[in-house]
Amino acid sequence: MRKYIAIIIASLALFTGQAHAQRCLPKMQGIEVRADMADGFNPGGKDGGYSFGAALSTYTKMGNKWVFGGEYLLKNNPYKDTKIPVAQFTADGGYYFKILSDARKIVFVYAGASALAGYESVNWGKKMLHDGSTLHDRDAFIYGGALTLDVECYVADRIALLANLRERCLWGGDTRKFHTQFGVGIKFIIN
């Protein structure tokens, strides 16, 4: 009888598939790459914006995580028949709290706050416009914060798809202070 029970236990251990509970453990790290739309989606319009970013996330207790990364945001402001680009290069660091996850540890929802600092360039530093007008906005160092709602969906043990909604507030520049971003990304667990 003991031999029969041992065979059943061994077969259950060998043939039940992978364990899904080994995700978001303390000190696990992942590299994520994101692409976002900034301040709405307006195909064909002159006021569209987008951003690209990369970050390193390190998990802590309870599935929470620290995230440190960099981001490039380009927002076009309409002016007559053309557009004036405003580019922001920022570094950010923040803490994200896990607010929801499923029992199999496939989907995680995070809410977090980040501090940001960087540089803003208006029209790539050119003050004179094509029609002879002069820009009074200047390039500047910027600082501020961001609130983020982030969703991770694991498609494999070391690969997760990301979706996020983010509100950035930055001071120091001459242009808009608030930027709403939404987008997608991919995360690779590296240890």
Question: Residues of each region from the PLM?
Answer:
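Cleavable N-terminal export/targeting peptides
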Residues: 1-28, 191
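Short glycine/proline- and aromatic-enriched beta-strand/turn motifs that initiate or cap beta-hairpins
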Residues: 20-75, 187-191
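Residues that define the transmembrane beta-barrel architecture of outer-membrane proteins
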Residues: 27-31, 46-52, 83-91, 107, ...
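Residue-level detection of beta-strand scaffold positions
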Residues: 34-36, 49, 65-67, 74, ...
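Extracellular loop and loop/strand-boundary signature of outer-membrane beta-barrel proteins
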Residues: 40-42, 77-84, 131-137, 169-173
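Gram-negative (and chloroplast) outer-membrane scaffold detector with strong preference
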Residues: 55-130, 159, 188-191
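Predominantly the C-terminal beta-signal and adjacent terminal strand-loop region
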Residues: 73-75, 150-191
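Extended low-complexity acidic/polar segments
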Residues: 124-165, 188
